[in-house]
UniProtKB/Swiss-Prot annotation:
Positions of modified residues (N6-(pyridoxal phosphate)lysine): 268
Family per similarity comment: Belongs to the class-III pyridoxal-phosphate-dependent aminotransferase family.
GO molecular function, one term: pyridoxal phosphate binding
E.C. code: 2.6.-.-
PROSITE patterns given in the database record: AA_TRANSFER_CLASS_3
Species classification: Bacteria, Bacillati, Bacillota, Bacilli, Bacillales
Keyword Phosphoprotein: no
SUPFAM superfamilies for the chain: PLP-dependent transferases (SSF53383)
Pfam families: Aminotran_3
The name this protein goes by in its record: Uncharacterized aminotransferase YodT
InterPro entries documented for this protein: Aminotrans_3, Aminotrans_3_PPA_site, PyrdxlP-dep_Trfase, PyrdxlP-dep_Trfase_major, PyrdxlP-dep_Trfase_small
Amino acid sequence: MSSYLIKPELSSAYPVVSYAKGSYVYDQTGKKYLDGSSGAVTCNIGHGVRDVTEKLKEQLDQVSFAYRSQFTSEPAEQLAALLAQELPGDVNWSFFVNSGSEAIETAMKIAIQYWQEKKQTQKSIFLSRWSSYHGITLGALSLSGFYERRYRFTHLIERYPAISAPHIYRLNHETEEDFVQTAADELDTMIKRIGSQFIAGFVAEPIIGAAGAAITPPPGYYERLSEVCRTHDVLFIADEVMTGLGRTGRMLATEHWDTVPDIAVLGKGLGAGYAPIAAAVVSDSIIETIKQGSGVIMSGHTYSAHPYSAKAALEVLRYVLKHGLIKQSEKKGAVLKKKLDEAASQSGIIGEVRGKGLLLGIEFVADQKTKKVFPPEQAITQLIVSEAKKRGLIVYPSKAGIDSGEGDAVIIAPPFTISDGEMEELISIFSETVAAVEKNLKKD
């Protein structure tokens, strides 16, 4: 049968999904896959949860669409209220969109408009980090320090990445405390060089995702960087698309650093795969400034605050809270990391296991002592992903967080609902996968 669907790799064959339940996905041949990455770190509560799907059927029968400039809806209002209740600090006001990329660009627009309302119209530049990924639309890509995804569009996008990634694994004779100070000084210097009067915000993933396989900053990092932002009147925007809503064992990952952003960007786990939805969640002070000014946020999409998507996110969040899944993410993540560390000790190519909660990254190296990376042509990441999939395990390909774009890594991020037995299965298949790839490398 011919296919006219544009897929990630145009010449590759993909299995056709048949159904999914819990932590497993099944293709049309009947093959079972353990979803070790929750899709794209998305399916936080697993597949086919009837508490959610039954409510969604009811929603479709009640109202399938309402345009946000004509009506509001109960699901959108209730979701916004629940987020305001559960998110830390005064990050209380939700603007719902359809994807993380849209949510990032909404956050950028709101930040710029905030400064316009304060008569500081020159503040329209953003700072971000290298080894970061904030989305594939042009504004989000402008923030992304991810060469592989930037280079084709360099002439169209802004050069916002300016700050080093907090890659502790690759520190050279520097303590974590010294690194935090160096990072704060780097941000401070960059703001001064450009001029704080031109900078609207600093954007960062609390734990780096696709560009860095769960690179996790040391203690004190965001406390210091957010302090630098406040000193220079620069908004701190936390890209929590991958990390938010319990993935790291906290509602927002910035809570690990006792930090509350001015804007939190949510996605992926917000709808948890049941519907496309994302959000820019904004502080009271930003909203109050805009309310006292123009009174209008200049952004929106046809499907913003879609009732069905809002209902999906509402029921997902209710399910997470009802079953204590954020705490489960923290506990299960600690167990899984320990088991991955044990597996790494038996491998000659795993350099580091890192992350928090159920967002874990594994970086592969050619030499564990020197941390030398594999040559790009060896395509270690793809070998690991393909071998794992062949054995019935899905893991998420990632970069290793090196500015040059070199290095190999994968992300393991199963649903919060993964059982102890499923974790054992995950570890077993992953260990076998790494051993098989390593054995083939030795043959070569």
